[in-house]
């Protein structure tokens, strides 16, 4: 977390070394993440507040959510009540529905990428693997977190937004 000097506000900051981004062939993914987050305004999607760079690093500044990752709650508590699971499921569904209405496929839905705000609402974060301009089942790239990959991706078939529901 970081603090804005003039206001004292606390934010989360993602710092990427440019040479690391280039070496790992992540330039397009990084640019896509910034482009998407600059334009998305949704209550269940993290907001990009600022983005800047130095000669060696890229910085993306987001609202800070002190509720932590959904993964943490699952790994320490084991499970949610049916009501809480439905509540989170509804918010995730609304976030993905909004992304899909903008022809964005998220491709990395997992508890580690779901943050909780102070009121207990979901915030989808980490758009590094997202893809814009997905109208039909026209995506072929193999990406995502292995434990959460949809069958279409594993089989190296073309796919579309439906993989986000897996």
Description of each model-found segment:
Residues 153-162:
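Conserved end of the kinase activation segment
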Residues 2-10:
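Conserved N-lobe loop of protein kinases adjacent to the ATP-binding glycine-rich P-loop
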Residues 88-89:
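Activation segment signature within eukaryotic-like protein kinase domains
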Residues 50-51:
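A short, aromatic-enriched beta-strand patch in the conserved N-lobe beta-sheet
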């Amino acid at each position: 977390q970081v603090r804005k000097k003039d206001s004292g506000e606390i934010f989360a900051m993602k710092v990427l070394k440019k040479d690391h981004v280039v070496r790992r062939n992540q330039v397009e993914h990084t640019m896509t993440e910034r482009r998407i987050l600059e334009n998305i305004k949704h209550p269940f999607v993290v907001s990009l507040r600022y983005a800047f760079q130095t000669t060696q690093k890229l910085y993306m500044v987001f609202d800070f959510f002190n509720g932590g990752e959904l993964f943490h709650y699952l790994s320490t508590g084991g499970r949610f009540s049916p009501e809480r699971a439905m509540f989170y499921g509804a918010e995730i569904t609304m976030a993905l529905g909004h992304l899909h209405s903008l022809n964005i496929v998220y491709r990395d839905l997992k508890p580690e990428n779901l943050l909780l705000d102070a009121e207990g609402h979901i915030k989808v974060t980490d758009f590094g693997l997202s893809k814009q301009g997905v109208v039909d089942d026209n995506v072929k790239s193999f990406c995502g977190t292995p434990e959460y990959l949809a069958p279409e991706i594993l089989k190296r078939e073309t796919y579309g937004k439906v993989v986000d529901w897996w």
